[in-house]
Amino acid sequence: YYTPKSIVTLIVEMLQPYNGRVYDPAMGSGGFFVSSDRFIEAHADEKHYNAAEQKRNISVYGQESNPTTWRLAAMNMVIRGIDFNFGKQNADTFLNDQHPDLRADFVMANPPFNMKEWWNAKLEDDVRWQYGTPPQGNANFAWMQHMIHHLAPKGSMALLLANGSMSSNTNSEGEIRRAIIEADLVECMVALPGQLFTNTQIPACIWLLTKDKSGGNGKAHRKGEVLFIDARQIGFMKDRVLRDFSTDDIIKITDTFHGWQADKD
């Protein structure tokens, strides 16, 4: 289940993980961690720091259910010299959370879209379902709530989901979405163009959530506000079937987001 590299880069650039705990509960082979590592290297000159020293301020936590992919992710980190904690073993994120006490500064994931086979009766009154029990036939809001649960008090997160997550009212999804919005957790929504994925035609969006919109530290007070970015016309056709974002496209979207975060007229 592959996330396009440009979308991984976009999410990392939007979240800006310069230091703190980075967590991906559906990590695959660890693409978000590699991208976070590269992010620190890419911004070293502009921010006047030593990349190797700066990387010591990041700690990486991940989980993956597939044993081969889990080992591949570990290998990926070792090759790049990234310290990591991927739990004791590969495991189902919902049934066997490898980091139950983790509260991360940055949580990022591209879980499988509209995952049907995820429910187990043991999950009925789970502490993670703070905004409502997710429907048994779709894990979208289970992933989102799992990530919210693992956010530090001032943490931010980004989640790539199918567009249906913005409007679906199946079972409890509408109520959960309403509760999350009313809790003022949603910071920004990015609508993405179609044809970004090799394995699905489902159009996708990025949900960016944060526990703290009160501003300070160069950020504006944004309580009660949500930024909507329509990126559906952005990008270029890489070949006949696949669309992609250029570096300039990524900069355009991230500058829009960071400008809104900082600017208050």
Predicted regions and their residues:
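Conserved S-adenosyl-L-methionine
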Residues: T3-A109, N114-W118, D125-Q130, F141, ...
